[in-house]
């Protein structure tokens, strides 16, 4: 690619992104006026008010989020991310991501944290009606009609997790909120560990500040999907770490990855598409003849099949769940949502969640190793999109892919020009804070 084409590509991507978002907002408002069953309220995003979800408001926690963003900007300007040890980069990113997302949610007070966990459509509301764990798994497909919309749209795994928490005395809404907070931090750390294993220390340091202020953090803190994202991220990290290890160690990394990805399949059906990311890493490892690749595959496949087999023995076959959820999906709002709009609207919602720095990064990223992660996630997202299984609500549904795409923004950050990192963080944080102030999200 010639130099002028390289300069033109990010500009073209930004223009296309702006056009997609603008069209989706304008067309979405028209769609909402003529289709009262669209149930979005802030198309292409979802608002808590299904008529008009755009509610400008101010919370003092947004000032806190702004101050945290300024701290990250200052750290970029002073070169802090490049000087400190890796453990401090991981810790700062993990804690920063949790704090930034929490401060955004707190702009609506405690309700901003609780609503996504205790709403009647969410998982927690189903504990009272769900039978004991064994019976719940065994009858899940046959009795799927009795549960709320989010349980009907997912495998039974997260309800089982809530049942376990309830059994050990961690009942109620706040343990669920804590899971989302923890999932946000774990995701950031796992993604950085993967980037380090795949592309090296410098790319990890470049990506770190962007994971703190990513706009998709708005939805990480207020939905169970934060747990799904964390489990998937840990699985990818286990694969990445195992590939370069000796066979004796690699097989155990593979087992860990298999357990994590096997579990992910029973938390969200999209876990199957996320497998494209570790699959690309494994193919690259085989081509490079990395010593641990075959052991990771063997351990991962064995452990993953063991998890699937355990659920099958308990009475739940994954493919039956997929079919039941597909039927439920088209009995709900999906039947009233026009694909002609969501073909673009879904992409627009994803662009909003990822932020403009990610879009620019996709245009300038040249590292082949980074593209293993970014490209795998983009392919997984595209597969989900073209399945027509997601029409709207993708700012939450596609959270499982967003961190792996967001790291493309690291390509705009240069160690030699510290203002690049400061500017990138400032832009992403501003987008997140303004969006939180304008949108009263359902999650």
Show the residue positions of the predicted features.
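Transmembrane-helix motifs of polytopic, lipid-linked glycan transferases
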Residues: 71-77, 175-198, 206
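Short acidic/glycine- and proline-prone juxtamembrane loop motifs at membrane-interface regions
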Residues: 216-228
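Membrane-interface helix-loop-helix junctions at transmembrane boundaries of multi-pass membrane enzymes
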Residues: 246-247, 289-297, 362-378, 390
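Membrane-lumen/periplasm interface segments of specific transmembrane helices
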Residues: 17-34, 263-266, 281-363
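Start-transfer (signal-anchor) and selected internal transmembrane alpha helices
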Residues: 1-18, 50-118, 298-300
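Membrane-interface alpha helices of multi-pass inner-membrane proteins
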Residues: 212-219, 235, 251-269, 273-280, ...
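Specific aromatic-rich, kink-prone transmembrane helix
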Residues: 190, 228-246, 257, 405-408
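Hydrophobic, aromatic-rich transmembrane alpha-helices
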Residues: 70-74, 349-374, 378-385
